[in-house]
């Protein structure tokens, strides 16, 4: 299997499957997917981060609320997950529904989820 084929197949994974893949690779090879931090750079980073406006947001489902079925439908539409995976995500709240999306898209997704009855926050 070529690297290009492997990358294409990984690209077809759902968010849940990709997360499971990362965990499996971390366990198998004893590594972490978290980036390494250099001490000198870490001290300067908070000042730089404060000056820059956040451009990517994570949409986090904090609670399903009263209309759980409607929330599951919206989660399925947003993520492309199957019914069981979407239900598990809603039942397991707080869960990240979408990662690293633009501010406009994050606000749109947040509105859709809130309209369905969910409690949502942006990180």
Curated annotation (Swiss-Prot):
Assembly and oligomerization: Homodimer. Part of the ribosomal stalk of the 50S ribosomal subunit. Forms a multimeric L10(L12)X complex, where L10 forms an elongated spine to which 2 to 4 L12 dimers bind in a sequential fashion. Binds GTP-bound translation factors.
Family: Belongs to the bacterial ribosomal protein bL12 family.
GO MF, any single term: mRNA binding
InterPro entries the record matches: Ribosomal_bL12, Ribosomal_bL12_C, Ribosomal_bL12_C/ClpS-like, Ribosomal_bL12_oligo, Ribosomal_bL12_oligo_N_sf
Entry protein name: Large ribosomal subunit protein bL12
SUPFAM superfamilies listed in its UniProt record: ClpS-like, Ribosomal protein L7/12, oligomerisation (N-terminal) domain
This protein's record includes keyword Ribosomal protein: yes
UniProt keyword DNA repair present: no
CDD domains (UniProt xref): Ribosomal_L7_L12 (cd00387)
Function: Forms part of the ribosomal stalk which helps the ribosome interact with GTP-bound translation factors. Is thus essential for accurate translation.
Annotated transmembrane regions: none
Key words of the record: Ribonucleoprotein, Ribosomal protein
A single Gene Ontology CC term: cytosolic large ribosomal subunit
GO biological process terms, semicolon-separated: translation
One Pfam family it belongs to: Ribosomal_L12
